[in-house]
Design a protein with these regions (language model features):
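Glycoside hydrolase catalytic-domain context in secreted enzymes
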Residues: 1-464, 473-487, 511-954
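Extracellular/periplasmic metallocenter environments
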Residues: 468
Length: 954
């Protein structure tokens, strides 16, 4: 047998040197990448554990400032699941009922519609829900005792698995799709139709629409629907859905429609169809919410939700319709914008006012008012008392609610006010929600008295043109106890409140820390009273027809010189050169630890001594590396913190911690139950404690300006008062467990289109800005409160104090031409100076050039939501820059000190950080690779010499 030829030295060395070189280069590259993106790796694989070395003199102090209310993490999880179902149960809105609901328990039903098998649970992006662990629509029905038609369900499931429906791809409209995806009625085969007879107690028809981060729903379905009709949009029923409704009416005596959407839809056709017996809105139910849907259908739960948005008959006639979407200046590269031409007149504020002025026929224009919702029982109301304070006081109205029906239920009482309006004067809506209250569960015949309370000054309007202040004009204000935004409760007359003299709040209102006046004249200047090329017309009640919003013209798309200048990138050197501040002290150790500052006032002098300890590197380490965490600073006893995203619970698509997925924020708002939202905040706080979470990138406080906005599922409502009260309750509940909630996105982040394309410029006049878009944030900042505990002497005495909201997230968009996160008037003057906010602001995800960290810390955005080294400071050494970073650190550290991040820490304790497990794996891999390389080199040397010897001996 011929002996196989041995590889030559030349070939052998070429092969092995190449292999060893590639391994070496790859190993070095991976280690360099890990070093650069260490914070990103930490976010996914873990930051490592921390050990607290107690001060022996304080070993008997109870430093668990916030305690888990359950025995273990499983207890917290089970409580969260129960709360999630409870929120859905109270948020479901019975829109229509011709006496068919509730269905009989144990009824045999047929579920129709793709959405029955392919439901909407949340939204895409940060609002996604793990559907593998979710209770499905079918399971919810079966858990409530219904028998479900298996034949039809299997057909729907198979169709859904092989046919596309709408899919919003984050910040990539070209990759997104907008198919309704409903199965044509031809898909209901002969066998399917034959099966109806065995499951004919009711047809339950599911209609679904989903939203998502980074994209809006489409206002024109051309190209996305094979049966497209001119002007068809995504939020109306398409032909396949209408055919399905017709099929249900043909074969079933009872037809119930489930609206599985957090975006309002055009439902007039269903409401006016006598063959559709009931309509139930369920929003996006989250992880277990479909259990509650089944319970409402069976009568186990009496629905008590109310619509958080108005439901117009024709969205294309809405004043926001033409000014939503993709518009850009022709003379600015990346100059995208949106005109809020409607001002304060959007949602129910427009429809109620336009009807009062005779501009529209309300019954034709509106399907369901804001605040609408039916029940399985009846209620009567009566005024039990009223206390009408003076203009510096409060209005309180007591209403006794009695269940006059035969089953237990809850009711919602709504207080609106109608302010006197002078044609051509300050713009005013015909009605505005002032307060609301929800009863407890009232048994048949049972009564409860609820109190509706609001400050008189809350009825003031903001006059951005003349007084440049809030103004409570003289005249008679009507206080209206209503079922919804349109209908007075039977037998309850309006209450008159007389303001004898106009009050102009030049010194601010009672809740303002400084006088309030115009801060956004660079935006206001673009608004005019009549139509002019290049300007925005104020939509006025004085002439709805003549000032009705129109789409931007070519002239409007030519930016003025001032607007062009506003888009010029931030120049830190130029701005800082104008500053005359002195270089602050750095690196001066005083022995203080962060725990020593817990409980101290924000402006306590000890903070300055403490901050003197920081080095510039400390400041850069924290402020430029804030994605989903803040960094540990052992030198000052600052622990690392963990912050998670997810608008409906800690369910972020970034990181490896996932908790309960709650129903969408719209469902939360639709409960009209602030007490429930506080309890939900407490339960969320327990989940946070069980999972070592310190902060939450939520709740979302933006408004439903347009039903087409992709992130409406993340935001509560069109109404700022409802949003503010619901949000404040949730924030306070979370704070009771030491969790700081980042109310977001501050501010005017009401569409997704072009959000990251250099920041879409939102042009909104200051009246609408303050009364509508800033109002939910203002209510939460001024009202949120929770008791905290701390030690303040050497004896271990426990002190308590109240602390408010301590975290805010800014937004991608611009206010006018200025990036919101870099707007000093927005981030400092309004937020901190006027409202008194104490805490820190984090940017939205900071990957884009227009979001400059220097501009952020100058304006009051303290932490950059990004991973090192994605962003850097233009100027990190000047006195102005260091002062700005020091202020940012003050804000960040104040929030941290007064949070659950300090659990286990007392004065004198030390923090030891343990290396994360993944780092040991990396070290082990490096050692193994190193040994392999050494062995490889030795083998090459040995083999080469041996081969030479063999050749020499031949």
């Amino acid at each position: 047998m011929e002996k196989k030829a041995k590889m030559s030295n030349k070939t052998f060395k070429r092969v092995w040197i190449t292999v060893l070189s590639l391994v070496l280069v790859l190993a070095v590259a991976v280690n360099i990448a890990i070093s650069i993106f260490e914070s990103y790796v930490n976010n996914y694989l873990g930051y490592g554990t921390y050990e607290i070395i107690e001060n022996p003199n304080t070993s008997d102090w109870d430093s668990q400032y916030y305690k888990l209310d359950y025995d273990n993490a499983n207890g917290a999880l089970n409580a969260a699941l129960a709360m999630s179902e409870r929120v859905e149960a109270e948020g479901i809105v019975l829109m229509k009922n011709a006496g068919v609901l509730p269905l009989q328990s144990g009824a045999s039903v047929t579920m129709l519609g793709r959405d029955a098998a392919d439901s909407v649970y949340g939204g895409s992006g940060s609002g996604s829900v793990d559907i593998d662990t979710a209770v499905t629509a079918r399971h919810g029905m079966e858990n409530a005792g219904f028998r479900v038609n298996q034949t039809v369900y299997d057909i729907l499931s198979a169709y859904a698995s092989s046919n596309a429906k709408a899919d919003i791809v984050m910040d990539n409209p070209s990759a997104s799709s907008y198919y309704i995806g409903e199965m044509p009625v031809s898909g209901y085969t002969g066998n399917a139709v034959a099966s109806f007879a065995q499951y004919n107690d009711a047809a339950v028809v599911y209609i679904g629409r989903g939203g998502g981060e980074g994209g809006d729903l489409t206002c024109d379905m051309q190209g996305w629907d094979s049966n497209y009709t001119q002007g068809q949009h995504q939020l109306e029923l398409n032909k396949d859905e209408k055919d399905m409704i017709a099929l249900a009416k043909q074969h079933f005596d009872k037809v119930v429609v489930i609206i599985n959407s957090s975006n309002a839809m055009e439902l007039g056709e269903l409401e006016n169809d006598p063959g559709v017996d009931a309509i139930l809105w369920v929003g996006s139910p989250g992880q277990v919410g479909f259990n509650a849907v089944g319970q409402v259908l069976s009568g186990g739960v009496n629905p008590s939700g109310r619509t958080a948005d108005i439901y117009p008959a024709d969205f294309t006639k809405d004043p926001t319709f033409v000014n939503f979407g993709d518009y850009a200046y022709s003379n600015i590269n990346g100059g995208y914008f949106v005109h809020y031409e409607e001002g304060i007149y959007y949602g129910y504020r427009y429809y109620e006012t336009a009807a009062a002025e005779g501009f529209i026929n309300y019954d034709e224009a509106v399907v369901y008012p804001f605040g609408h919702g039916l029940s399985y029982t009846d209620f009567s109301w009566s005024i039990a008392g009223q206390r009408l304070g003076d203009v510096d006081g409060d209005i309180e109205i007591d209403v006794t609610v009695t269940n006059t029906g035969s089953v237990a239920g809850k009711d919602v009482v709504q207080l609106y006010y109608s302010a006197p309006y002078t044609k051509g004067g300050i713009e005013k809506s015909q009605v505005v929600l002032g307060a609301f209250a929800k009863t407890k569960l009232l048994n048949a015949g049972e009564s409860e008295t609820v109190t509706l309370k609001m400050a008189v000054e809350d009825m003031a309007s903001y006059d951005y043109k003349n007084a440049k202040a809030y103004v409570l004009e003289k005249g008679v204000y009507q206080l209206l106890i209503q079922n919804d935004s349109h209908n007075l409760k039977d037998d309850i007359s309006a209450i008159s409140y007389d303001v004898s003299a106009t009050v102009t709040y030049k010194d601010g209102r009672s809740g303002d820390k400084i006088p309030v006046t115009n801060q956004f004249d660079d935006v206001n200047v673009l608004f005019t009273d009549s139509k002019q090329d290049g300007y925005i017309t104020d939509f006025s009640r004085a002439d709805f027809a003549g000032t009705f919003p129109t789409a931007p013209t070519a002239a409007d798309m030519l930016a003025t010189e001032a607007v062009v200048a506003g888009f010029v990138p931030y120049n830190a050197a130029a701005v800082n050169a104008e500053s005359d501040v002195d270089m602050p002290a750095t690196g001066i150790q005083s022995g203080l630890s962060l725990i020593d500052l817990r409980g101290l006032d924000y402006d306590d002098p000890l903070w300055e001594v403490f901050l003197d300890q920081l080095t510039i590197d400390d400041m850069l380490t924290v402020t430029l590396n804030g994605a989903y965490h803040t960094e540990v600073l052992k030198s000052i006893g600052k622990p690392a913190t963990t912050e998670l995203d997810g608008p409906a619970g800690f369910t972020s698509f970034m990181g490896n911690i996932n908790c309960t997925s709650y129903p969408s924020a719209v469902v939360m708002a639709s409960t009209f139950n602030a007490e429930l939202m506080y309890e939900m905040g407490e339960v969320l706080g327990n989940e946070a404690l069980a999972n070592k979470i310190n902060g939450w990138y939520a709740p979302g406080m933006n408004n439903h300006r347009s039903p087409f906005a992709g992130r409406n599922f993340e935001y509560y409502s069109e109404d700022p008062v409802l949003s503010g009260i619901i949000g404040e309750a949730c924030v306070s509940g979370l704070a009771s467990k030491g969790v700081y909630a980042f109310i977001k996105h501050y501010a005017v982040n009401d569409q997704e289109t072009n959000r990251v394309n250099n920041g879409v410029a939102a042009w909104v006049n200051e009246q609408a800005l303050r009364e509508i878009y800033l109002r939910p944030f203002e209510i939460t900042i001024k009202s949120a409160s929770s008791e905290m505990h701390y030690f303040s002497d050497e004896e271990g005495t426990v002190f308590t104090k109240n602390i408010g909201a301590t975290a805010v997230m800014s937004s991608f968009n611009r206010i006018g031409a200025v990036w919101a996160g870099g707007s000093y008037p927005l981030m400092t003057t309004v937020l901190r100076d006027e409202w008194g906010f104490e805490g820190y602001v984090i940017t939205d995800f900071n990957l884009y050039d227009f979001m400059v960290p220097d501009q952020g810390v100058y304006a009051g955005s303290d932490l950059t939501l990004t991973f090192t080294p994605m962003k850097s400071m233009q100027d990190a050494t000047s006195a102005a820059s260091v002062t700005n970073m020091r202020n940012a650190m003050h804000n960040i550290l104040y929030t941290t000190a007064n949070s659950n991040a300090m659990n286990g820490l007392v004065s004198g304790a030390q923090i030891i950080r343990h290396t994360p497990t993944w780092r040991f794996v990396q070290i082990g891999a490096d050692i193994a690779i190193g040994l392999f390389l050494i062995a490889g080199v030795l083998w090459v040397v040995i083999r080469t010499r041996r081969y030479k010897d063999e050749v020499a001996n031949v």
